Amino acid sequence: MTQTVHFQGNPVSVAGKLPQIGDKAKDFTLVAKDLSDVALSSFAGKRKVLNIFPSIDTGVCAASVRKFNQLAGELENTVVLCISSDLPFAQSRFCGAEGLSNVITLSTLRGADFKQAYGVAITEGPLAGLTARAVVVLDGQDNVIYSELVNEITTEPNYDAALAALK
């Protein structure tokens, strides 16, 4: 399945299907900042916010990580996973420089299948190969309780709606 989002107003195709409310989240294995493999199942029993974005080295993506880091400190039994195509070194450098410790960064470095499975694989245009901007919120049993594929990649996600799903 292919969906369309926009980058600076221009349409770009995104492969796969974003999980929808009521779906069971597919397990995945991504790469942590220490280069270890981390699976969704590593966070069993916890609620999860998947903040998915193209690159931590862009202003909007960096802003989303900062915002979710701030919000994560207020959430009980919840982990915020910030997922991008960046190398784990870049993710670690950014969070270290910014003093961000409430989120967990994960890279698609060895988990390219995640992009297709979660419907965020940008397949054309200048961002081809990166992940589209999306937020998926899971309950403690990995059921999707909120899902947003951001239409314009250069805008931030709807933080309030994502948080409302956790209330």
From Swiss-Prot:
EC number per UniProt: 1.11.1.24
Keyword Oxidoreductase annotated: yes
CDD domains: PRX_Atyp2cys
Gene Ontology MF: a single term: thioredoxin peroxidase activity
Keywords: Antioxidant, Disulfide bond, Oxidoreductase, Peroxidase, Redox-active center
Every Thioredoxin domain range: 19-167
Top EC class for this record: oxidoreductase
Gene3D superfamilies for this protein: Glutaredoxin
Record has Nucleotidyltransferase as a keyword: no
Residues forming the catalytic site: 61
Positions of disulphide bridges: 61-95
Reaction catalysis annotation: a hydroperoxide + [thioredoxin]-dithiol = an alcohol + [thioredoxin]-disulfide + H2O
One Pfam family linked to the record: Redoxin
InterPro entries associated with the record: Redoxin, Thioredoxin-like_sf, Thioredoxin_domain, TPX, Tpx_CS, Tpx_Peroxidase_subfamily
NCBIfam families associated with the record: PRK00522.1 (NF001808)
Role noted for this protein: Thiol-specific peroxidase that catalyzes the reduction of hydrogen peroxide and organic hydroperoxides to water and alcohols, respectively. Plays a role in cell protection against oxidative stress by detoxifying peroxides.
Membership in a protein family: Belongs to the peroxiredoxin family. Tpx subfamily.
Subunit structure: Homodimer.
More details: The active site is a conserved redox-active cysteine residue, the peroxidatic cysteine (C(P)), which makes the nucleophilic attack on the peroxide substrate. The peroxide oxidizes the C(P)-SH to cysteine sulfenic acid (C(P)-SOH), which then reacts with another cysteine residue, the resolving cysteine (C(R)), to form a disulfide bridge. The disulfide is subsequently reduced by an appropriate electron donor to complete the catalytic cycle. In this atypical 2-Cys peroxiredoxin, C(R) is present in the same subunit to form an intramolecular disulfide.
Protein name, as recorded: Thiol peroxidase
Organism listed in the record: Yersinia pestis
Encoding gene per record: tpx
